[in-house]
């Protein structure tokens, strides 16, 4: 396995605020780029309202269920697997 790239919060937010709230439909283009393992240098909260999906967190598959909340912390390794149908909001932020 190759080196796992770290993703900065500013790469996600596309600004220096180090904070962003996105509807999942607006976040899909960025999620597609992150369909390989990557390390977070920020925190992420996913509020999924509808449909099902999946992701890897520290190389373990985690389901994304309707009406669920997923929290990712700084340093975790993450990979989007099945995200095309989820609907909700993503919050990203640094300390």
Name each region found by the language model.
Residues 1-56, 60-63:
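Generic protein-terminus/edge-of-domain signal
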Residues 59-73:
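Short acidic-glycine-tyrosine-enriched beta hairpin
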Residues 49-53, 73-75, 84:
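Short, solvent-exposed loop/edge-beta patches enriched in aromatic
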Residues 75-95:
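Ligand-binding loop in jelly-roll beta-barrel domains
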Residues 39, 71, 92:
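Short aromatic/basic micro-patch
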